[in-house]
Amino acid sequence: MTNVPTFMMNIPSSYDTAVRNNVWMEEYDDEDIIVNKPKAIREMWEVYSFLASQGFVYLLPTPIDCKLQDLVFVANNGIVLQHTPIYIGSNFKATNRIGEEVIGMRFFDSLGYKTIRSPFEFEGEAELKYLRDNIYIGGYGIRSDKRAYEWMESEFGLNIIKLELKDPKNYHLDCTIFPFTNESVIVAVDSFTKEEIKSIEKVADIIPITMDQAHTGLTNSVRVNNYLLNASDIDFLSKRSEDYRYESDKNRRLEQIAADNAMEVCYFNLEEYMKGGGLLSCLVLHVNYERMLTKLI
């Protein structure tokens, strides 16, 4: 299975929005934020089915009577290191999420991985993006501690480009950074200092996007083979609304990037997960990065 793009997802049987633990959730009133569970399962299953048609997808089991409302956002559960069979479990700053990493670590332990919980605050693959070899890009400052990356460098020989996150709407790195290939990275360039941008440029080419395009979820994408998967609710927005204008601009930019690289964009409606502050990349954890090795043309 090592040559097959492999991912992990979770059926959202415990998904809820009772605890508002990010700024995006504050935009909903008490009635609109309630999760339609059957619809959430259908939305997740659409993404699962597509990924499974292109590779392999593990399903992280949800324990009976599980109360972890955000378990479905597996990109925060931890990260699989690519040069050695080790799974680093998260150390959540969001207190209602503590315990998710235990379920993930047990699962990867059953697969034969060595599992270790980060001794410092760290919220998983959503904060630490793999590029190639031992090179990663890590976000810190809101949900993750910079010391977590220093520990990983010392313990596992990683080379981590560390970027400070300051915008509460971009509280995880995947809100501003998307490794498009192992040599290029989509970046919301206004999110970072000139020095931070230069540190990225030392290891990869930068494909720039705007902050508005980041806020509407452009970098919350997943690549599998020659497809880019992204969440979009544009079909349900009024064409006269400001939200439609922002969403349309994001989609056009993503489609431009895809077209320039002989790729195709596939959109998924994930309205139920937007209630929890999540988009497509939040639902997916990479077990490997074979999609990075696939030739674009």
Spans of model-derived segments:
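The feature marks the mature, well-folded catalytic cores of soluble enzymes
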Residues: 1-297
